[in-house]
């Protein structure tokens, strides 16, 4: 200690873990969940709030929790306290817990018992615990004195893949073992002789053609269920297994999963199974699928539990999410699909179109011009009118609103539009709008104040009709307000429309895929030079004219703003205005969030629906503020929730190339469509939303490849962040609101997630996810961190620009704004705006002489990013930083960000390394009376680190950047200033830190587990030479150089120099290690074992002097550590 003086060694403690949920168990109205070695306790009291009561950290040491077994109470009362055996991997610990309504207290804890074999199952036997071990043996353990009482092996010492213990005493204990030979072995440990000789199996049961992963026994009915690698679930009639020699009969072979089945559980009336396909299926005991729960992401559902009294199923997934689902009986009241039996001799003609007026009235029109109404309360068809002018071609649309405002509109091929009051069809009003075919109809509603009907005619002319009702309510008035003109295209008609609040603009989508903004009232744009251009019939000869009009009247107003072909050539399917944003959907499988600023449409974010849903038909906003997506997945109509990643409703309708309609209210939702010449109706009570509860949001479905801290948000006392634990159990000084760190993560699942990590609650809140990438996200970079309103008018919150990059040589730039919002669980609202994107193959496709160039490898991956902040007065480049990218094709590429990230341009590249570049990092060198130098370092798979002077390269007229061989190609960066051979193999981590002496510490970690630390000196001439002289290139040299060959046992994937005397490193060996610097070779200080496997990235940052540092480790999960300096 004397050698270290008064320096205090940092001790890292785990603050937060987000890992796959591997164990679940219901105890009364509480849920026990195992996440890594931690125990999570949730309160499932449905009369109050569903919330976490307690997190017991590090209960199983370095083992993962796989199961819980609660000791039965003679009185059956587990509401006050319980004795729980927690097991997983090779560890067992017994803990006694006292719990109340909103608190939990640990009364007693046994020592951690380390077994020599894997524990597959545990069972309480009269105060002792029996364990089924991995090589077909059973041990009896006394948890109080901590000793083994019995150890009985089976004669067949095969490796097990699962086991189930049955019985309440040692004498009747039965083990059903799932062997790797795909057999079930039933044997009885108590039949062993006094010398504990191996016991022979009583029965061998075969049937599965794959390894058996899970089994469940229902004693009351004598049933055994097994889940297997062969993607099936089998139900066996076994009777009382505690009696030897019984007969085993296979009574059910259930196929419903598309991948391996991990878990199975038998209930009194149901069978629950969950697997690698992220689906939880509810079966009857006869093998019929009753329900299917989909919502988890990633590689499967790892744990299931059931609360039979409340009829809930609880699932824990690989995405670290926990969800509750209603079982049938308390479940989702779907009424299914029914035929409305339209075909009748009294109703001639064939059906042409169908629509819904609210959720309980169906409208249909036939090819003889008959309009019919079906009332779901009366349950019969009624003819409203018949008009032979609509017999060959007819469009039908009902007005929006809860019950359609009692209006519908018909249009034919001769320019005629008929507006029909449903309750008084004799009061219908005809409008002859065009001298040709009406291509489309749509309604636009502004509250209960304004109702418009838009009709598209020949030549791209859209007639806007204003609909109003007479004071008596028995008549309607139809008045043409104005006409719009769509941009030229082959299929020139609009497809949808909506009012933009407060009602000055109309947003329309057209068949070409464009989103257009029109004035709702032309009188608003009467000032010269303002608004849309008025186009006359002479300027648009194909537009046609209104009946009784002349050729000199205004035919159409052009859009004030447009986003051309936003959704591709398949067209826009819907536009919706909500919360100050415009949402558009299309048949390109995406939906856009748009913003109108200064009368201009601006794209904010592009999102994708679930995989395979290429036809998105619309969006609906739920009462709880969430959004659901309507669309077609092959021949199915699907209602999908982006929040829960769940298909809420699935209707096998045959696809979207037919007449269909959807209506949604809080009371019910309805979907009507034509099939086999009849009207089919799917109806479900309760609206779109399915009654499930997300106890904890999932993070990523695949491995997390990168993590980056953005900044910190400070909330005032009015934004109280909810604590996970009861206030009595919190440490002093941790009450109330505090600092919230904003962290972004990228994953193999192609998403970028924004997380809020409060410093006082030990929680993680997923704010939003960005799904723009088409392949995995490998690297993240942050720049321009500030506050909303800027430095002049600062507001609480955080703003930043983020660059993400990964597979398929794809890069995206988006802006991030975090603001306080008391209505959300995290007390924060996150706003994302997509700014720009870049792909190397698209860049190649845009080149005119691309036939002379070699096309970039489409499998190129961006491995790492670094922001290079140039001086703001750089001539010729304009404002904006450079982004350096390490590429798998051996290149280091420089991209220029301009216009606050809205322009992303490839500027220069170099293939100096000639092999995969793994890391890039940038730093600045500042010295008195000298220019600020920007230096980039890059590291490759050969262990070399190259240093580049970007300041000289970016100077106007500099010859450091060599001109390209062909116009349009990027510049070449030339040769580096210095190359250091730091390692013998790939460099996976790299960091630098300036020293007080004016030098730079450079640290790197390699694939061979070694560390390399050296001091880099940057030497420059004392005086800058004038323009026109020879360029000044800095001289870089290494002063001190040290290596630690065996610092870690595996790849070093994260390294950070915290100070000139302290460094921290992380590795795949799951060690977070601190090193002392400054006295020669780095000296080991201490190491902490973390629980995230395959760590791919690490980021560390100081919080404040009172809280110290925080460190985020990302891999197959996320773990946050903190330590005090």
Curated annotation (Swiss-Prot):
WD repeats lie at residues 89-130, 155-197, 207-246, 256-294, 295-335, 346-384, 433-475, 489-528, 567-605, 611-650, 652-692, 725-765, 767-798, 860-905, 912-958, 982-1024, 1047-1085. SUPFAM superfamilies: Quinoprotein alcohol dehydrogenase-like (SSF50998), WD40 repeat-like (SSF50978). It holds the Pfam family WD40. InterPro entries: Quinoprotein_ADH-like_sf (IPR011047), tRNA_Anticodon_Mtase-Reg (IPR051973), WD40/YVTN_repeat-like_dom_sf (IPR015943), WD40_repeat_dom_sf (IPR036322), WD40_rpt (IPR001680). The keyword Acyltransferase does not apply. It is found in: Cytoplasm. The modification N-acetylmethionine is found at residue 1. Keywords: Acetylation, Cell cycle, Cytoplasm, Repeat, tRNA processing, WD repeat. Induction: Down-regulated by caloric restriction. Up-regulated by insulin and IGF1. GO terms for biological process: G1 to G0 transition; insulin receptor signaling pathway; insulin-like growth factor receptor signaling pathway; negative regulation of autophagy; negative regulation of cell population proliferation; tRNA methylation; wobble position ribose methylation. Its main location: cytoplasm. One of its GO terms (cellular component) is protein-containing complex. The keyword tRNA processing applies. Expressed in hypothalamus, hippocampus, cerebrum cortex and cerebellum. GO terms for molecular function: enzyme regulator activity; insulin receptor substrate binding; tRNA binding. SMART domains: WD40. Interacts with FTSJ1; the interaction is direct, and required for 2'-O-methylation of position 34 in substrate tRNAs. Interacts with IRS4. Interacts with STK11/LKB1. Belongs to the WD repeat WDR6 family. Together with methyltransferase FTSJ1, methylates the 2'-O-ribose of nucleotides at position 34 of the tRNA anticodon loop of substrate tRNAs. Required for the correct positioning of the substrate tRNA for methylation. Required to suppress amino acid starvation-induced autophagy. Enhances the STK11/LKB1-induced cell growth suppression activity. This is tRNA (34-2'-O)-methyltransferase regulator WDR6. The gene is Wdr6.
